């Protein structure tokens, strides 16, 4: 019998010492510990020599006594790594490895019986040199390995020992988890799996946040595009508030050409009917405020040296820079008309009108195309709002109603127009109350006030008075001619 569980090397003179203790000790655990300790003490081996002997093995042939069978049972049931029962020493795998054949597999912890090819020896052990076998002792009784196996099979074994043996020999997960190394590996695997789950959760959260950011960006881009289409960018004044100083505008000729059309203050191009109705209610001289008529053509003011449309297109197509437009105060407008040359740009009057109720200033040009800024102030002081939300009672201008609908998740496709004739009449009254200077400037065709100069001229020359009186009489007749033109628009 080969006891690989001890991992010790011995010679033939040590075997009687070992078997002498087999019949003294009745405790199996004490027997194993005492055999190993006494064996090491008797040989007086150093640590280095003992480490070299760990790769050797012990070969013992035992009898079928009770103590021997108990020792074999203990070795089998308590999990020694390398333990086997062979019929002869020649059948040991180490001899096959020594002869140069393939390396043997490590024997399992079971008692296997093989056919008896040769008669077994009574006591055989491996010396330091395997090529010199040791003769057996003749005093010991010979016992075959078959009897040992039969005694092991017929001997009553406690249920606990059988369960331990099955747990040791079976390849189930519980057996693998019984060792600390397996538990540590399992713990590492669980930790890695937990980390992977956490990483997956974080990745999903990042993807969700990125999708939310993209959705918000797209929503803002769409809102900006819609606001641009409704003319919300025109809420802010495009001109400098310092109306008393001469400034240079960066607007191109195309901006000036499209400037009279941008008068809806967020109402969109589809609100021509509202603009025409307000034109009908107001005096015809206010028509240029809605971008419908030209004030200079109406009142016969001095024509401005503007370039024709064909020449303007040619200059734009050739890539030449368009002429800059100078903005002058009202008092300097007439002087600039007489003194400027052909190469100068278009000159416009830039004046600021303050609300008579709240004092809010509003800057406009000579064409009156920014009248929507005045309308914004009028809407503040008026209780009548032109548009209403489809889903609630919120009222206001079109841009405010659409913004409210988007914030409240209401129908934001278009605002509900609730304009009536009473509202238009009230807005007309509010215009005269808030901006009387604007009304007077429109009535005189954006000409500067020359009341004192006219009085002096009346005293000096009566002919000039007659001419001025004829001009004053022509103004209402010309306005009456414009009324049929404004009525079809309604």
Swiss-Prot record:
Signal peptide: none annotated. A zinc finger (C2H2-type) spans 353-381. Residues 96-176, 236-262, 302-326 are annotated as: Disordered. Expressed in somatic gonads and germline precursors until the 50-cell stage. After the 100-cell stage, expression is seen in differentiating hypodermal and support cells (at protein level). Residues 101-120 have a biased composition (Low complexity). Residues 123-132, 151-176 have a biased composition (Polar residues). It comes from Caenorhabditis elegans. Residues 101-110 are annotated as: PEST. This is Transcription factor lin-26. The gene is lin-26.
């Amino acid at each position: 019998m080969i006891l690989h569980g001890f991992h010790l090397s011995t010679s033939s003179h040590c075997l009687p010492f070992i078997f002498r203790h087999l019949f003294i000790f009745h405790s199996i655990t004490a027997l194993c510990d005492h055999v190993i300790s006494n064996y090491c003490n008797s040989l007086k081996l150093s640590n280095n020599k003992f480490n070299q002997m760990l790769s050797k093995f012990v070969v013992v042939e035992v009898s079928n006594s009770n103590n021997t069978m108990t020792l074999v049972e203990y070795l089998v049931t308590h999990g020694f790594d390398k333990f086997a029962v062979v019929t002869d020493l020649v059948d040991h795998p180490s001899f096959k490895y020594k002869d140069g054949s393939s390396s043997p597999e490590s024997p399992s912890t079971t008692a296997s019986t093989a056919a008896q090819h040769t008669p077994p020896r009574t006591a055989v052990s491996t010396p330091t040199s395997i090529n010199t076998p040791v003769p057996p002792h003749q005093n010991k009784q010979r016992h075959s390995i078959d009897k040992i196996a039969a005694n092991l099979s017929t001997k009553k074994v406690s249920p606990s020992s059988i369960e331990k043996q099955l747990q040791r020999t079976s390849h189930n997960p519980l057996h693998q988890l019984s060792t600390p190394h397996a538990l540590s590996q399992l713990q590492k695997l669980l930790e890695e799996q937990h980390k992977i789950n956490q990483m997956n959760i974080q990745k999903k959260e990042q993807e969700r946040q990125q999708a939310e950011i993209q959705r918000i960006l797209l929503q803002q881009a769409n809102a900006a595009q819609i606001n641009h289409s409704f003319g919300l960018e025109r809420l802010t004044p495009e001109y400098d508030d310092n109306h008393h100083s001469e400034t240079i505008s960066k607007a191109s000729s195309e901006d000036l050409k499209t400037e009279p059309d941008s008068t809806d203050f967020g109402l969109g191009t589809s609100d021509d009917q509202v603009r025409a109705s307000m034109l009908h209610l107001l005096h015809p001289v206010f028509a240029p405020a809605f971008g419908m008529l030209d004030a200079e053509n109406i009142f016969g003011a001095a024509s401005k040296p503007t370039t024709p449309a064909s020449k303007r297109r040619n200059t734009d197509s050739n890539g030449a820079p368009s002429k800059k437009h100078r903005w002058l105060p009202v008092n300097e407008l007439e002087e600039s008309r007489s003194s400027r040359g052909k190469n100068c740009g278009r000159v416009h009057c830039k004046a600021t009108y303050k609300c008579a109720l709240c004092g809010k200033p509003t800057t406009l040009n000579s064409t009156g195309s920014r009248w929507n800024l005045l309308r914004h102030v009028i809407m503040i002081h008026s209780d009548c709002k032109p548009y209403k939300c489809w889903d609630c009672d919120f009222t206001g201008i079109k841009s405010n109603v659409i913004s409210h609908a988007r914030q409240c998740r209401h129908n934001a496709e278009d605002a509900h127009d609730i304009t009536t004739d009473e509202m238009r009449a009230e807005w007309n009254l509010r215009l005269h109350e808030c901006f009387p200077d604007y009304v007077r400037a429109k009535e005189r065709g954006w000409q500067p006030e020359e009341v004192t100069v006219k009085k002096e001229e009346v005293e000096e020359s009566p002919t000039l008075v007659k001419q001025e009186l004829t001009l004053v009489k022509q103004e209402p007749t010309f306005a009456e001619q414009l009324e049929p033109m404004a009525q079809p628009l309604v």
